[in-house]
Amino acid sequence: MNMAQTVTQNPRGVKTLLPLDVELRNVFKFFNQEPAVHGVDLDVRQGEFFSILGPSGCGKTTTLRLIAGFEQVDAGKLLIQGQPMTNIPPYRRPVNTVFQSYALFNHLNVWDNVAFGLRLKKSRKSEVESRVKEALKLVKMESLRSRFPSQLSGGQQQRVALARALVNRPAVVLLDEPLGALDLKLRKEMQVELSNLHKNLGLTFVMVTHDQEEALSLSDRIAVMNQGKIEQIGTPQEIYERPKTSFVADFIGDTNLFSGEITVLEAEYIQIVTKTGLTIVVARNEDTPAELLKPVVVSVRPEKIQLSLYPPSSLNNCFEGRLINVMYLGTHVNYVVQLINGMNINVLQPNTFGNLPDRETPIYAWWAESDCLAINQMTND
């Protein structure tokens, strides 16, 4: 089979070629003449855990449904394992979908739910027996094979839904917010199980979610979507540490954003004066905007900001303010500091189990030039 390939690096840094299991090329999908998916380009590599992350209504679920075949592409190309999927129905695509609602058959027990697809394909009885047994073992549900969905917990139902998807041995497993219906503790447990399952099977997983922590913890790469378009594709670390747009910076985790323009350009740093009069110095990297008077947004993560009662000597990015809120979070403490220009910033620091400062305490907030990031100001920011 003639599959497209992509260059990647293994842990030793040696470049290798990996086939692409899913390719979207300038894909559009319209509803009532409005684009739900707007010129999307993305590649999913064989064996990759790829997440599409974004807020409600951003087009991520529609994109997944296009890959599954539940919706048809209006413009552009969609390929799975190098083959065009135009007019190919869902049952003929080498994919299986796990839905948030699980979509189990209530009148069938666990075994029959998992076996349903194989029986529909008229697989041999011996093959059905061995593959269902294997799938239930993978998700640790062998002992509950005779139970009905109504007799299972949410986590157990999720495992059955996963087994039903895996039993057909698809090239690509599609996950539609698979953990969204679970409580926080169970969701974290299932994240670990899902990650282990992916590593053990080596299959390609494509997941859509609005949960940033879920995407960051599970994914090899993430595509961040907004208003039908891809804002950025990268590893979890790239997405969090080096966001390309202010939307990505603000959506992934928490951040403090300062709008301003570049007033000084030097080889190793730029200086920005914000709209509220602060002067911020940012260390340069290959993505740093480099044009005088260029409108930019400065992003500073709360955990990168330090607090002190006295001003550090000879330090850029040090601003006087006062505490207006202190929130105890157990292992961490979240501080809200109002700077002298009236802007409120969030600061997250480890809990050192000392006495917490009182509200209205005068304080200095500061951060290193390398701990903030300048991003091009977009017209819709």
UniProtKB/Swiss-Prot annotation:
CDD domains assigned: ABC_PotA_N (cd03300)
GO MF annotation, one: ATP binding
Location in or out of the cell: Cell inner membrane
Cross-referenced SUPFAM superfamilies: MOP-like, P-loop containing nucleoside triphosphate hydrolases
Membrane disposition: Peripheral membrane protein
Predominant cellular place of this UniProt entry's protein: membrane
Gene Ontology CC annotation, any one: ATP-binding cassette (ABC) transporter complex
Catalytic function, reaction form: ATP + H2O + polyamine-[polyamine-binding protein]Side 1 = ADP + phosphate + polyamineSide 2 + [polyamine-binding protein]Side 1
This protein's UniProt keywords: ATP-binding, Cell inner membrane, Cell membrane, Membrane, Nucleotide-binding, Translocase, Transport
Keyword Membrane appears in the UniProt entry: yes
Record-listed ATP binding positions: 54-61
Occurrences of domain ABC transporter (ranges): 22-252
EC number: 7.6.2.11
A Pfam family it matches: TOBE_2
Domain of life from the UniProt record: Bacteria
Quaternary structure and partners: The complex is composed of two ATP-binding proteins (PotA), two transmembrane proteins (PotB and PotC) and a solute-binding protein (PotD).
Function: Part of the ABC transporter complex PotABCD involved in spermidine/putrescine import. Responsible for energy coupling to the transport system.
Family designation: Belongs to the ABC transporter superfamily. Spermidine/putrescine importer (TC 3.A.1.11.1) family.
Name of this chain's protein: Spermidine/putrescine import ATP-binding protein PotA
Gene source species: Nostoc sp. (strain PCC 7120 / SAG 25.82 / UTEX 2576)
Chain's gene name: potA
